[in-house]
Amino acid sequence: MVAVPAVAQERVTLGWGRLLTNDAIGDGKDRWRTGSYVLSRVRGPNWSGSLPGRPGEILEFRMRLETIAPADLVVANPLDRRYVGALSLGMHTHFETAGVESSIGMDAVIVGPQTGISSLHGDLHDLLGLPDPTVFGGQIADDVFLTLTAEFGRTLPLGANAQVRPFIEAQAGAETLVRVGGDMTFGGFATEALMLRDSATGQRYRAAAGDRVEGLSVMLGGDIAKVYDSEYFLATDAITPTDTRRRLRAGMHWQGAQSEVFYGLTWLGKEFEEQPDEQVLGSINLRLQF
């Protein structure tokens, strides 16, 4: 974990970031990386529109819920992945040195029935009158995985109102991988803002606002990862995890005088060899003030 230096100034809340992701607002097929919600609270002495030059001044406290599921919750298929209910709690610091934007942090990823996610999922099926799931008994068992994540990127301007940001990311813990990719933004969405990244989709979401330029912004991105290990697959299972993962994403953000709306789509490549198809997730964030 990165050592956090003492900061003389009092910390205040600089902003909140959140993103809801579900395949119900993507391809609508309710399977695999089926849903997640991330909530970030960012604290620091102040936000001036740019990252500080050292770690520890700006801290992000992150909570994330994720459901990973086989395609059929009622009839177990040995050639499909196991159910995963994951709750992660962590702290990350964001800073910039020599033009390189850095994010380093640690999360405790809690999995298994102890999270209560599968119970909540079952209750939702009861409420909607759907068949009772039978795959929860074979879900990834109770455990806690300490997960270190580091991302390094550089924002490069493309004219007056666009930017491109190549990045590299390394993660070790619940899943161990190295990822390279990039994001392009057309419009004012990311201008002087503290941008965070959702781990499942790679979609970027805003925590500390910058100029809040009114109008539409368009985001495009993609990345590829080399996967070394994943605690979400068991060696005894009949499926084979892929060692390469690909993602493509696009999003649109509207900023009004007081309100804002974001909607994005993410294409995910296959995560195990027996997976019959890719999937598309939808992500949404609403901040409405009247």
Regions found by a protein language model. Give the residues of each.
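Short glycine/proline- and aromatic-enriched beta-strand/turn motifs that initiate or cap beta-hairpins
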Residues: 8-49, 54-58, 63-75, 223-233
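Short loop/turn motifs that connect adjacent beta-strands in outer-membrane beta-barrel proteins
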Residues: 8-13, 45-58, 96-103, 155-164, ...
